[in-house]
């Protein structure tokens, strides 16, 4: 029933998705992605260098950084730079974003250069990491297209599309794309990263209250597949615009 969710959405319904390319001027790729009221700025920057462990190997690197503006949430948080270090949650999320994007790149075709995806949360209402992955992919494609047009690389290193969505069990019902009201009151929370071939790149699932059953897990994965399919279509529509 739609009235079982605070937003009134159906259990298998995404929030409205907006992917706006070219949001800032200077980066090779720049995307504002919105999952409902969650808004993340994703920029892709190209540098002609690689980490030390890759020097001389002819391979490129894709990495990510993640952060939230101080008032992205209901109350202001200090900037992590002011604290002198990144928090554990930040490190976990940016590593997830980096892993997810590396899964769709032929790093040999990229050559010895690094593409950094900076994902800055402007407004948080749940699902910031999944929105970041979904938007960062589009920014990555735009950056690669710049390299192709400049003749810096000879073949496209993008192997396929990647998108991510959250699913969870909210008041006994498996639901798709949790907002903050659901995420803060759910029994199970899971983030699912998939590619356009239907393969799973990463699954992060935790029982917040009661342990989830196998049938609930299967239902959640089914919802995630549906949601990712719709997000992949939104990415393609944005890239074709």
Swiss-Prot record:
The keyword Transferase applies. It comes from the Bacteria. It catalyses: tRNA(n+1) + phosphate = tRNA(n) + a ribonucleoside 5'-diphosphate. The keyword Amino-acid biosynthesis does not apply. Its EC number is 2.7.7.56. Phosphate binds at residues 89, 127-129. Keywords: Nucleotidyltransferase, RNA-binding, rRNA processing, Transferase, tRNA processing, tRNA-binding. InterPro entries: ExoRNase_PH_dom1 (IPR001247), ExoRNase_PH_dom2 (IPR015847), ExoRNase_PH_dom2_sf (IPR036345), PNPase/RNase_PH_dom_sf (IPR027408), Ribosomal_Su5_D2-typ_SF (IPR020568), RNase_PH (IPR050080), RNase_PH_bac-type (IPR002381), RNase_PH_CS (IPR018336). CDD domains: RNase_PH_bact. GO terms for biological process: rRNA catabolic process; rRNA processing; tRNA processing. GO terms for molecular function: 3'-5'-RNA exonuclease activity; tRNA binding; tRNA nucleotidyltransferase activity. Phosphorolytic 3'-5' exoribonuclease that plays an important role in tRNA 3'-end maturation. Removes nucleotide residues following the 3'-CCA terminus of tRNAs; can also add nucleotides to the ends of RNA molecules by using nucleoside diphosphates as substrates, but this may not be physiologically important. Probably plays a role in initiation of 16S rRNA degradation (leading to ribosome degradation) during starvation. Homohexameric ring arranged as a trimer of dimers. PANTHER family: EXOSOME COMPLEX COMPONENT, EXOSOME COMPLEX COMPONENT RRP41. Belongs to the RNase PH family. This is Ribonuclease PH. It comes from Stenotrophomonas maltophilia (strain K279a). The gene is rph.
């Amino acid at each position: 029933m739609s009235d079982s969710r605070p937003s009134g959405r159906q259990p298998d319904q995404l929030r409205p998705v907006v992917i706006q390319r070219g949001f800032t001027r200077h980066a090779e790729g720049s995307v504002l992605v919105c999952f409902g009221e969650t808004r993340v700025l994703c920029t892709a920057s190209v540098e002609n260098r690689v980490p030390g462990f890759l020097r001389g190997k002819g391979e490129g690197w894709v990495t990510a950084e993640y952060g939230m503006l101080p008032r992205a949430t209901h109350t202001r948080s200090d900037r992590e730079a002011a604290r002198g270090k990144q928090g554990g949650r930040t490190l976990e999320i940016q590593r997830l974003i980096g892993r997810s994007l590396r899964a769709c790149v032929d790093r040999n075709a990229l050559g010895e250069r690094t593409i950094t995806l900076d994902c800055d949360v402007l407004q948080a209402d749940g699902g910031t990491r999944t929105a970041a992955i979904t938007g960062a992919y589009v920014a990555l494609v735009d950056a690669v297209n710049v390299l192709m047009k400049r003749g810096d690389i000879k073949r496209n290193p993008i192997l396929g599309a990647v998108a991510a969505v959250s699913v969870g069990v909210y008041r006994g019902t498996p639901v798709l794309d949790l907002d903050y009201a659901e995420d803060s009151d759910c029994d199970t929370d899971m983030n699912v990263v998939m590619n356009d071939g239907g393969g799973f790149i990463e699954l992060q699932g935790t029982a917040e209250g009661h342990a989830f059953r196998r049938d609930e897990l299967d239902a959640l994965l089914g919802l995630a597949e549906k949601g990712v399919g719709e997000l992949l279509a939104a990415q393609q529509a944005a890239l074709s615009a």
